[in-house]
């Protein structure tokens, strides 16, 4: 490893306050594997502090792959777009790099098309415009993906697209040529197969054409029984186009898959093509879900009660440190927004009176609070029980369920699952849902592979709180009341009243 790579590695390590294995498991419950590749695996995990599911990509650091690993981390740190997978935290050890990312709940574009056969043009247009928005953002940032294919594009249940896996991506300067041959043969541009210096953004345009063709036909444009014949067909740039496709779409496909890269359009030029702008020329706003530079004071105050420092929160967001503080803030804010978007089934109340949160489940738990300097306390541990990596408790006794006030925990809440139709009691998002296990469910597909989670096994819970904690819960409750305008009052909360979980 060269000195430049060592400096980059040290830079990454400095961004992570918990740079050891214990740090990873102290913050996340590792669940089942949901994807794997040549030098990396992706696991489903649960953030202990918020109970939110995340994807943890584990990359082994080897001499040959080290520069590529660092490149992927840096690219994800640069990217902040609603249609690009969000990086939340980086934890690095001597042998591994852990990338904690948001969990995309849906299917890959490949699975989506295989199930549908092919998409109608208006359906394909809705997805393709999101891809264009993301790739235009990347190219403006000097990022080239180089492996854009249906397996690396996630489609969530609400139709939102997320581009994942920047493992072959790189950073380029204007006019810079690339030499590395990489990607997948059926999606590779002719100039890459010729092993000549190529323009990075232009090969992304070619793969966008192959992906669009796959969406509207259910097939790839270039296919053959051998690599040699496949390369020959790609270099010739000849493929069949179904006559049922509109003239505008046929024209767009021919532009995207132009064999000569000099004649191939840029992504910005594709975005104004008549087929793309038909119906509406509006594209996703890149600022829609960007990480805030200035934190919400109410969230900061609430996080302060569980050990976070206000200045550390502000610095972590402004400098994009991708540490524990930044991850906790981002996951908590997403939970709050999700809760605020929920429809409520409450009794009519006096419109002139602002509802206040209710202490629905007043069961309390005992937590031993131990905190390092400038590090938030994560009160999920119990001195009388041990939790294995897979989340199963070694204790055979049935403990009481962990509960916070409704502003901090979900009352009567089972382990979160991928099942969006599961019912549960209405409450404001939890800061400390102490679920120590979520077992996989073989029936549900999800993200970066085939994510599965289940509530078949009961979650492990900690023991009861001492009575003296009531004052603390009231203090945190007061701080959290400002977080969400849709917090129900005690009059409208019922333990037996469940409702459908929100569509994520």
Curated annotation (Swiss-Prot):
Instruction: List cystine links.
Output: none
Please give one Pfam family short name.
Answer: Pkinase
Record's function text: May play a role in sperm motility, especially in the regulation of flagellar function.
Keyword Transferase appears in the UniProt entry: yes
Disordered, as annotated region: 389-421, 441-468
The protein in question is named: Sperm motility kinase 3A
Expression (tissue specificity):
Testis-specific. Expressed in the testis from 22 days postpartum (22 dpp).
Q: Which residues form the active site?
A: 147 (proton acceptor)
Residues binding ATP? 34-42, 57
User: Coiled-coil regions in this chain?
Assistant: none
UBA domain residues are 294-334
Originating species? Mus musculus (Mouse)
Q: Which PANTHER family match?
A: MAP/MICROTUBULE AFFINITY-REGULATING KINASE (PTHR24346), SPERM MOTILITY KINASE 3A (PTHR24346:SF95)
Q: Which stretches does UniProt call biased (Polar residues)?
A: 441-451
What is this enzyme's EC?
A: 2.7.11.1
UniProt-listed InterPro entries = Kinase-like_dom_sf, Prot_kinase_dom, Ser/Thr_kinase_AS
| Protein origin, superkingdom | Eukaryota
What does the sequence similarity comment in the record state about its family? Answer: Belongs to the protein kinase superfamily. CAMK Ser/Thr protein kinase family. Smok subfamily.
């Amino acid at each position: 490893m060269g000195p430049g790579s060592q400096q980059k590695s040290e830079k990454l390590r400095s961004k992570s306050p918990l740079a050891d294995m214990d740090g990873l498991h102290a913050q996340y419950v590792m669940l089942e594997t949901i994807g794997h590749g040549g030098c990396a695996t992706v696991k489903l995990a649960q953030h202990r502090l918020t109970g939110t599911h995340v994807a943890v990509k584990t990359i082994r650091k080897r001499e040959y792959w080290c520069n590529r690993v660092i490149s992927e981390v840096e690219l994800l740190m640069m990217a902040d777009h609603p249609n690009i997978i969000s990086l939340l935290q980086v934890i690095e050890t001597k042998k591994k790099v852990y990338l904690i990312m948001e969990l995309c709940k849906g299917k890959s574009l490949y699975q989506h098309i295989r199930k549908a056969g092919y998409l109608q043009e208006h359906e394909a247009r809705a997805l393709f415009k999101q891809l264009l928005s993301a790739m235009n953002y990347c190219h403006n940032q000097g990022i080239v993906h180089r492996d854009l294919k249906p397996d690396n594009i996630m489609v969530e249940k609400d139709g939102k697209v997320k581009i994942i896996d920047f493992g072959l991506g790189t950073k380029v300067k204007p006019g810079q040529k690339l030499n590395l041959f990489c990607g997948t043969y059926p999606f590779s541009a002719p100039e890459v197969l010729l092993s000549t210096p190529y323009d990075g953004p232009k090969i992304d345009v070619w793969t966008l054409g192959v992906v669009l063709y796959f969406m509207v036909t259910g097939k790839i444009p270039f296919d053959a029984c051998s690599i040699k014949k496949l390369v020959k067909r790609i270099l010739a740039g000849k493929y069949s186009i179904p006559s049922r496709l509109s003239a505008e779409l046929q024209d767009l496909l021919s532009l995207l898959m132009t064999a000569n890269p000099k004649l191939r359009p840029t992504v910005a030029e594709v975005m104004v093509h008549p087929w793309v702008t038909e119906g509406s020329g509006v594209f996703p706003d890149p600022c829609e879900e960007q990480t805030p530079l200035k934190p919400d004071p109410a969230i900061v105050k609430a996080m302060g009660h569980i050990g976070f420092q206000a200045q550390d929160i502000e610095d972590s967001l402004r400098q994009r440190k991708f540490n524990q503080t930044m991850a906790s803030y981002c996951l908590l804010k997403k939970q709050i927004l999700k809760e605020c978007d929920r429809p409520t089934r409450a009794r009519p109340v006096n419109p002139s009176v602002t509802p206040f949160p209710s202490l629905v489940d007043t069961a309390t738990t005992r937590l031993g609070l131990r905190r390092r300097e400038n590090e938030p306390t994560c009160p999920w541990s119990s001195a009388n029980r041990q939790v294995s990596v897979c989340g199963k408790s070694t204790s055979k006794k049935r403990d009481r369920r962990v509960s916070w006030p409704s502003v901090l925990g979900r009352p009567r809440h089972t382990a979160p699952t991928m099942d969006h139709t599961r019912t549960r009691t209405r409450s404001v998002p939890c800061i400390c849902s102490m679920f120590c296990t979520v077992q996989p469910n073989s029936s549900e597909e999800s993200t970066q592979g085939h994510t599965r989670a289940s509530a078949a096994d009961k979650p492990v819970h900690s023991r009861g709180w001492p009575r003296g904690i009531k004052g603390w819960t009231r203090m945190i409750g007061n701080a959290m009341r400002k977080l969400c305008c849709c917090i129900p009052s005690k009059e409208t909360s019922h333990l037996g009243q469940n409702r459908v979980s929100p569509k994520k």
